[in-house]
Amino acid sequence: MAAVMSVNESTFDAEILKADRPVLVDFWAPWCGPCRLVSPVIESVGEKHGGRITVAKVNTDENQALAMRYSIFSIPTLIVFEHGREAARLVGYMPQEAMEERLAPFLA
C-alpha cells in the first residue's frame, strides 16, 4: 500500500470515516505553495508511521464539497479523524518534528 492515498468525495466516507485507526487527511491544492512544502513531510509521516496512522490527501480543487463539509478555509489544512470524527486540526506548514509532536497522541 502507498504511504499516502488519494481520496475523493466518493471514497472519503469508506476510507476515512470508517477506518479502524486514526487517519491524517491533508486538504491541499496543486497551486498552493505551502501545500507543496508540506507534501514531503506528509509522505514521510506516512512512510514512518503507516502502521499506526493512515495518511490521505484530498485535492480541494477537485473535491470542493468535501472542503465545504469540513470548513476548509485555508490550505494546507490537516485533519486527524478518529472513530469517524475530527480529533485534531492543523493549519499551515510545519516541519516534520512539530507535526509528529502534534500527532503523537494518535501514534501510540
Model-predicted segments: where are they?
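Short pre-active-site segment immediately N-terminal to redox-active cysteine/selenocysteine motifs
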Residues: D20-R21, W28-W31, S74
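Non-catalytic, surface beta->alpha helical segment in thiol-disulfide oxidoreductase systems
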Residues: S74, I79-A108
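Conserved hydrophobic/aromatic "anchor" residues
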Residues: F12, F27-W28, Y70, F81
